[in-house]
Design a protein with these regions (language model features):
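Walker A/P-loop phosphate-binding motif and the immediately C-terminal alpha-helix
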Residues: 2-45
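Hydrophobic/aromatic beta-strand patches that form the interior of the parallel beta-sheet core
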Residues: 10, 85-87, 144
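Short, high-confidence coil segments that cap the C-terminus of an alpha-helix
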Residues: 37, 118-119
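Short, ordered loop/turn segments at secondary-structure junctions
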Residues: 17, 44-46, 82, 91-92, ...
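P-loop/Walker-type NTP enzyme "switch/lid" segment
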Residues: 42-116
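Short, conserved glycine- and acidic-residue-centered signature motifs
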Residues: 25, 100-103, 153, 157
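Conserved catalytic-core segment of NTP-binding enzymes
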Residues: 120, 125-167
Length: 167
């Protein structure tokens, strides 16, 4: 994800699930694309990915195919009808829920090697502060935490921000 030359890498996180993180990520990606920017959205929720559903597209391959070595990162990318390039995460695959630091680092390196010329890479994180979320957020030049107006969402967002600023 070290596309520092021209690509802005934006991480969208939350302390708690169900606060609208994917909705914010998808809408940001589509809005930037509509403004004429070249945008890629990475669904980095390793076990419950659903950005492809929000974008209304079918993805024959996902991140699990890349991590297994079956496909390259470039081979799993799909272009949505909105023009956004999507790196689909995996959903319902148990091994993806326990991704290790080494695999997260491999994903970050794979993004750096992509030839795609993009202006914005939006990274839709899983909820919480897992090692994968922290690794992906560390690779982002801009970080946003989505929060709802309920006490547990606010408390979890605050805890997430505290952990993120320690990195």
């Amino acid at each position: 994800m070290d596309k520092a030359k021209t690509t802005q890498v934006i991480g969208i996180a939350s302390g708690k699930g169900g606060v609208g993180k994917t909705t914010v990520s998808v809408n940001l990606a589509v809005a930037l694309q509509a403004m004429g920017h070249r945008v890629m959205l990475f669904d980095a929720d390793m076990s419950l990915a659903n950005a492809q559903i929000a974008l209304g597209c079918r993805c024959p391959y996902n991140l699990s195919h890349f991590l297994s070595g079956e496909k390259t990162l470039a081979e799993i990318i799909v272009t949505t009808r909105q023009g956004v390039k999507l790196v689909p995460g995996a959903s319902g695959i148990q091994e993806m829920a326990a991704l290790g630091d080494i695999q997260a680092s491999n994903i970050v390196r794979a993004f750096s090697a992509l030839d795609d010329d993009i202006d914005f890479l939006i990274v839709d994180m899983a909820a919480g502060i897992s090692p994968e979320v922290l690794a992906f957020m560390a690779a982002c030049s801009r970080r946003f935490v989505v929060v709802r107006d309920d006490p547990s969402s606010i408390a979890d967002a605050y805890a997430t921000i505290k952990v993120l600023i320690q990195d």
